[in-house]
């Protein structure tokens, strides 16, 4: 998720990426998560198109944000948290607190849409454009196959 209305994701002051993680795996990697797993965010069932069981999963948020340093240069920081528990924060890391996550200060993703959407860094490509057409072609082929089979039966 980025700030609505920006056309370049690098212009957004915050960038959020959400993922579903298994609670047991979270507790084994991050001991501070013990007793804090569960569904505190309602987005878990909307992250994936498929209807998957989210009872033993938690939403983990990767938050990238830009803040000016003492000289006014924008520095990129990163915070990973789940259900209000901070799992990692670059501002708390002595090696990254001043210089940020990356020296270039840019978010770690690049959008390369074929057809851009208005007021958004996202877009779509030929697969998005042709998906419905291909579905119609497949249904038509199936109908012709069935019709051919029915017409070829001996009477």
Predicted regions and their residues:
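Extended alpha-helical, oligomerization-prone segments that build pores/tubes and scaffolds
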Residues: 1-155
């Amino acid at each position: 998720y980025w700030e609505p209305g920006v056309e370049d994701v690098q212009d957004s002051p915050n960038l959020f990426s959400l993922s579903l993680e298994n609670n047991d795996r979270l507790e084994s990697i991050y001991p501070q998560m013990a007793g804090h797993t569960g569904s505190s965010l309602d987005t878990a069932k909307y992250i994936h198109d498929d209807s998957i069981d989210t009872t033993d999963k938690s939403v983990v948020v990767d938050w990238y944000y830009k803040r000016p340093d003492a000289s006014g240069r924008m520095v990129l920081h990163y915070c990973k948290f789940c259900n209000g528990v901070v799992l990692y924060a670059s501002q708390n890391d002595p090696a990254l607190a001043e210089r940020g996550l990356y020296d270039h200060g840019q978010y770690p993703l690049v959008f390369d849409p074929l057809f851009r959407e208005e007021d958004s860094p996202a877009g779509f490509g030929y697969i998005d454009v042709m998906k419905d057409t291909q579905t119609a072609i497949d249904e038509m082929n199936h109908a012709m196959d069935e019709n051919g089979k029915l017409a070829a039966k001996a009477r």
